[in-house]
UniProtKB/Swiss-Prot annotation:
Residues that coordinate or bind Na(+): E40, G45, S441
The keyword Transferase is assigned to this record: no
Metabolic or biological pathway, per its Swiss-Prot or TrEMBL entry: Energy metabolism; oxidative phosphorylation
Taxonomic lineage: Eukaryota, Metazoa, Chordata, Craniata, Vertebrata
Subunit annotation: Component of the cytochrome c oxidase (complex IV, CIV), a multisubunit enzyme composed of 14 subunits. The complex is composed of a catalytic core of 3 subunits MT-CO1, MT-CO2 and MT-CO3, encoded in the mitochondrial DNA, and 11 supernumerary subunits COX4I, COX5A, COX5B, COX6A, COX6B, COX6C, COX7A, COX7B, COX7C, COX8 and NDUFA4, which are encoded in the nuclear genome.
Gene that specifies this protein: MT-CO1
Name of the protein in its database record: Cytochrome c oxidase subunit 1
Residues in cross-link 1'-histidyl-3'-tyrosine (His-Tyr): H240-Y244
Species of provenance: Balaenoptera musculus (Blue whale)
Cofactor: heme; Cu cation
């Protein structure tokens, strides 16, 4: 019975739960790695002592957080749980493929961990650039294992993307048009399309790297007529859409949370929100070389990538101001979930502003590979994606479990986390502007103060993570059941009780829209 339910599951709720648990567990590993990094940088001099080991930590931290924490939780966890409920579908379109998408991840994770523990580990950074990732600078099987790990995670995501696209387009009730689906469903749809178009390019790039390393090809080796810059183009053509994949489902969740706790029945500017997400998805594919301003591109190429990158600020601004407009004039309920959403809106915007700074190719020449870039993407990930995940979790936890969290503890958790992440990443802007480079385990004494403060902040965040574990334990042991939910047209996932029955719809859902 246990095996049939949890190993061979074809139920979107159970698979979503597996994704959430796996992502939470991987998040602990990723947090542990980040704390080792910050412990090393807490003061000048060496702690771990070995720069290769330090770089392995940095690389593993990135891969674990991206492929095994944010993506499984947002797309696999929240996506699986909520998309079928929100569109009134009995399950996902391909329930068994759904199960395979999940079970490809633990082996992938195992391969990544193995790559760190054999030979010298893969100390390449998450970008895995050759020639550093070639078989000379990284002899041994570490990088090969990392490549195989990425292949498995990539196949998992591609299959999941196919599943979500088919489900969303094909499994709505007859009377429901695409423009009547909730914004979270739209965000998952756009994310799935991005995954489907970008991951094959990554697969091509790392497969060529694999053959360069093992089969004597020279795709990225100038000695044989190859070009390492080609790898950078292939990687970033995936890598830039990837960062939008990480944030788009968060946009969808924030839209729902803000609408719900403002007491509104729908978000402000529904069509504009959709247009903004689709635009961000499209533009995300034509700006990749802004990661490569320092490799020596033509001035007109740099001008194009600078302006194209800045254009993304427009649809992003549409979303931010629509969230503020949704809040405006609402009967605001100060729940923990809304606090996460407000924190998201503010801090994501700060991260976006530093992004506009980095979009300028001339400025980026100076700031590239400094801590300014680290601060920028951690503001949009550690305070964008993670805040959205936390907000979505405290908002939908009663739906998933049937129990309510202790609101006071949840608010305290938010405050500790808020202080922790800001204390960790705000000082890194100063370090970057002073020219401290990324991916080094030691630094001149001049950078000591801000690094020490940054490391203190990371330990505050650790306290918040431990408190979160306690809060979840407290909810499951106290067993406060859900009393009532505010139902509106945009809240259909709550319609079937908390938690919903194992099989939501035994027959097709009947939808009678207000307009058609």
């Amino acid at each position: 019975m246990f095996m049939n339910r949890w190993l061979f599951s074809t139920n979107h709720k159970d698979i979503g739960t597996l994704y959430l648990l796996f992502g939470a567990w991987a998040g602990m590993v990723g947090t542990g790695l980040s704390l080792l990094i910050r412990a090393e940088l807490g003061q000048p001099g060496t702690l771990i002592g070995d720069d290769q080991v330090y770089n392995v930590l940095v690389t593993a931290h990135a891969f674990v957080m991206i492929f095994f924490m944010v993506m499984p939780i947002m797309i696999g966890g929240f996506g699986n749980w909520l998309v079928p409920l929100m569109i009134g579908a009995p399950d996902m379109a391909f329930p068994r493929m759904n199960n395979m998408s999940f079970w490809l991840l633990p082996p992938s994770f195992l391969l990544l961990m193995a790559s760190s523990m054999i030979e010298a580990g893969a100390g390449t950074g998450w970008t895995v650039y050759p020639p550093l990732a070639g078989n000379l600078a990284h002899a041994g099987a570490s990088v090969d294992l990392t490549i195989f790990s990425l292949h498995l995670a990539g196949v998992s995501s591609i299959l999941g993307a196919i599943n979500f696209i088919t489900t969303i387009i094909n499994m709505k009730p007859p009377a429901m048009t695409q423009y009547q689906t909730p914004l979270f469903v739209w965000s998952v749809l756009v994310t799935a399309v991005l995954l489907l178009l970008s991951l094959p390019v990554l697969a091509a790039g790392i497969t060529m790297l694999l053959t360069d390393r093992n089969l004597n090809t020279t795709f990225f080796d100038p000695a044989g007529g190859g070009d390492p810059i080609l790898y950078q183009h292939l990687f970033w053509f995936f890598g830039h859409p990837e960062v939008y994949i990480l944030i788009l489902p968060g946009f969808g969740m924030i839209s729902h949370i803000v609408t719900y706790y403002s007491g509104k029945k729908e978000p402000f500017g529904y069509m504009g929100m959709i247009w903004a997400m689709v635009s961000i998805g499209f533009l995300g594919f034509i700006v990749w070389a802004h990661h490569m301003f320092t490799v020596g591109m033509d001035v007109d190429t740099r001008a194009y990538f600078t302006s194209a990158t800045m254009i993304i600020a427009i649809p992003t601004g549409v979303k931010v101001f629509s969230w503020l407009a949704t809040l405006h004039g609402g009967n605001i309920k100060w729940s923990p979930a809304l606090m996460w959403a407000l924190g998201f809106i503010f801090l994501f915007t700060v991260g976006g502003l530093t992004g506009i700074v980095l979009a300028n190719s001339s400025l980026d020449i100076v700031l590239h590979d400094t801590y300014y870039v680290v601060a920028h993407f951690h503001y949009v990930l550690s305070m964008g994606a993670v805040f959205a995940i936390m907000g979505g979790f405290v908002h939908w936890f009663p739906l998933f479990s049937g129990y309510t969290l202790n609101t006071t503890w949840a608010k305290i958790h938010f405050l500790i986390m808020f202080v922790g992440v800001n204390l960790t990443f705000f000082p890194q802007h100063f370090l970057g502007l002073s020219g401290m480079p990324r991916r080094y385990s030691d630094y001149p004494d001049a950078y000591t103060t801000w690094n020490t403060i940054s490391s203190m902040g990371s330990f505050i965040s650790l306290t918040a993570v431990m408190l979160m574990i306690f809060i979840i334990w407290e909810a499951f042991t106290s067993k406060r059941e859900v009393l009532a939910v505010d139902l509106t047209y945009t809240n259909l996932e709550w319609l079937n009780g908390c938690p919903p029955p194992y099989h939501t719809f035994e027959e097709p859902a009947f939808v009678n829209p207000k307009w058609s």
